[in-house]
Amino acid sequence: MKTYQVDKNGYYGEFGGAYVPEILHQCVENLQNTYLQVLESDSFKEKFDQLLRDYVGRPSPLYLAKRLSEKYGCKIYLKREDLNHTGAHKINNTIGQILLARRMGKSRIIAETGAGQHGVATATVCALMNMECIVYMGKTDVERQHANVQKMEMLGATVVPVTSGNMTLKDATNEAIRDWCCHPSDTYYIIGSTVGPHPYPDMVARLQSVISEEIKKQLLEKEGRDHPDYLIACVGGGSNAAGTIYHFVDDERVKIVLAEAGGKGIHSGMSAATIQLGKEGIIHGARTLVMQNEDGQIEEPYSVSAGLDYPGIGPIHANLSVKHRAQILAVDDDEALEAAFELTRLEGIIPALESAHALGALAKVNFKPEEVVVLTVSGRGDKDMDTYINYKLS
């Protein structure tokens, strides 16, 4: 049977793999040899499920958005990842990875963060497990997501502002990898998305797959069937999208729509529409689609959303795109901002700017009245209030 899941060598079609400096070979190989044994063990599953239930507050609701549904002429359910502890889907992954890190005997945790949500989720589980935590964050993002920086510091993490390059997510990831190279024996790197060398894209997708597992059960209760007609999610690196589609990716009855950041317009030179603009290349240890110039130098991405301005894309999504399994839509800054205000006014839910890109895709698809659409609200909008207020003032 045709599958879009990872193969035994860590590839999704031609994308994926592990391209790492020699100093990290041993680290990455240990992780490759260990992660499935741990993730599939009964003791891990029991602890992971217990923490998701009692600490994160799962299952997250599947909410029928009636007024939004009326507007777009179909049945729209919102998967409410914004209601998780820490306000986004990121905690699903950090809880799983910190349990794995402890099993591997690591004592020091590092992470990269863009919008700060993964940083907060990592600092949170480090506080929970009493482990040292260092978070790398681009200086640009430190300034635009200051509330999350304060949360991380309150949780006991050291936040390191990164001043190289564009001073955003890509640069923070580079610094985290440098740190890992210097401390391979005692340090575990919790990557926040379905990016990086194998096994990270698969591991993060598996840990986030609790989202699609719940969607199946919840739809069965609400609609009498376990699959929607459409799944819609935003993609930066792609972890909330990977979790949303995980149990449906091989079910051709389900259409997949991925919304990437169009920035100021896909041809403006100020965008993060990696799938549509990228060419095959290697970034942060994985072969995937990368925004690059003629000489193969990585181009600086741009998005109003700090969580989506990444110049690569998870290899799972690169593969879904080239195989035409997913429809890729670029949603620009203004479309996302308008969609955020629309959801707020229609349903009383203020979404994260990242999630607003998924909402912005609704206007670009023609739905039929009987179709069931599940859209993942990956996070809540608290961290983006300054951007929202400034947008309305302008």
From Swiss-Prot:
InterPro entries per the UniProt record, alphabetical = Trp_synth_b_CS, Trp_synth_beta, Trp_synth_beta/beta-like, TrpB-like_PALP, TrpB-like_PALP_sf
Ordered alphabetically, the record's keywords are: Amino-acid biosynthesis, Aromatic amino acid biosynthesis, Lyase, Pyridoxal phosphate, Tryptophan biosynthesis
Q: Which reaction does it catalyse?
A: (1S,2R)-1-C-(indol-3-yl)glycerol 3-phosphate + L-serine = D-glyceraldehyde 3-phosphate + L-tryptophan + H2O
* Named cofactor requirement(s): pyridoxal 5'-phosphate
Q: Name one GO cellular component term.
A: cytoplasm
Pfam families recorded: PALP
Gene Ontology MF term list:
tryptophan synthase activity
If you read the UniProt record, what top EC class would you report for this enzyme, in one word? lyase
**Family as reported in the entry's similarity comment:** Belongs to the TrpB family.
Q: What function does this protein fulfil?
A: The beta subunit is responsible for the synthesis of L-tryptophan from indole and L-serine.
What's the protein name?
Answer: Tryptophan synthase beta chain
- Source organism (scientific name): Parabacteroides distasonis (strain ATCC 8503 / DSM 20701 / CIP 104284 / JCM 5825 / NCTC 11152)
Q: What is the lineage of its organism?
A: Bacteria, Pseudomonadati, Bacteroidota, Bacteroidia, Bacteroidales
Gene designation per UniProt: trpB
